[in-house]
Amino acid sequence: MDYTPLIEKRRQRLEELETVIAEPDFFNDQKKASEIMREHRRLKELMETWDSLNATEQQLADNQELAKTDDPELAELAALEIPELEAALEKLRSDLQ
């Protein structure tokens, strides 16, 4: 499933919230400010997790390719990191659910 449109929508909302938070009178309504800050924090954490997931997926793919190279030392180093990357991916996927 392609989550790109959903993630982009969330990223746009995060940018909107950051613009609102930057306004000088943002804290005049404490209740509204608190709600916005809570939503901002949740979206920021989501985007950070999503970005980490993508970076880890790319690193895993790179390591899988490097593990097939003719350089035995490089292949071994890359292969050693694969289980760690797979575990990190599982955790990130779990965090997104």
Residue ranges and their predicted role:
Residues M1-Q97:
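Charged, heptad-repeat coiled-coil alpha-helices that serve as long linker/dimerization "arms"
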